[in-house]
Curated annotation (Swiss-Prot):
Name used for this protein in its record: RNA pyrophosphohydrolase
Enzyme Commission number: 3.6.1.-
Encoding gene per record: rppH
Species of origin: Bartonella bacilliformis (strain ATCC 35685 / KC583 / Herrer 020/F12,63)
Signal sequence residues: none
Keyword Cell membrane annotated: no
Function: Accelerates the degradation of transcripts by removing pyrophosphate from the 5'-end of triphosphorylated RNA, leading to a more labile monophosphorylated state that can stimulate subsequent ribonuclease cleavage. Catalyzes the hydrolysis of diadenosine tetra-, penta-, or hexa-phosphate with the departure of ATP as leaving group. Preferred substrate is Ap4A. Also acts on diguanosine tetra- and penta-phosphate at a lesser extent. Required with IalB for erythrocytes invasion.
Length: 170
């Protein structure tokens, strides 16, 4: 028998979010893969920055570098800034039970900004050498301020904070 879980009693998953600036001052974004399990109404707004969980015993900066490589192939980056606060978002009701094995109410993220100093050929979102499953099906460079308008609504307030934190660093 299934029991309903009050998601407000669940913890936040600790993770990192990564903003990567190119030489022109634009930021890297990827579009989440659309799968048959997507039931969320905002599938047209699946653009986001790389992000991911922090493994047990892992420092947030190390997690940011690992996640960035796993999701984009990028290693040629220099740290610009780490946000001191953690930013949280809750998953919407329609996603409860469909994400992160129903163990978390949302995510609590430490954000980092990096400068990409490599060549575009380094960016690979579906590398066969990478044992991790691809998370993005497209990517592009855009102006930082545009992103809150093209992300899912439940992450928008976090992305607005990220824009505020990083808007004047390049």
């Amino acid at each position: 028998m299934d029991t309903m879980v009050d998601f407000k009693t669940l913890p936040y998953r600790k993770g990192v979010g990564i903003v990567v600036f190119n030489r022109e001052g634009q930021v890297w974004i990827g579009r989440r893969l659309i799968t048959s399990s997507h039931t969320y109404a905002e599938v047209s707004k699946l653009w986001q920055f790389p992000q991911g969980g922090i493994d047990e015993g892992e420092e947030p900066l190390d997690a940011a570098r690992r996640e960035l490589y796993e999701e984009t192939g990028m290693r040629s980056v220099n740290l610009i800034k780490e946000v001191q606060d953690w930013f949280c978002y809750d998953f919407p009701q329609e996603l409860i039970g469909h994400v992160l094995n129903n163990q978390y109410r949302g995510q609590m993220q430490k954000w980092f900004a990096f400068q990409f100093i490599g060549e575009t050929s380094e960016i690979v979102i579906n590398s066969p050498e990478n044992s991790n499953k691809a998370e993005f099906d497209q990517w592009k460079w855009i102006n930082l301020e545009v992103l809150p308008s093209i992300v899912v609504s439940f992450k928008r307030h976090v992305y607005m904070k990220v824009v505020h934190e990083f808007r004047n660093i390049i």
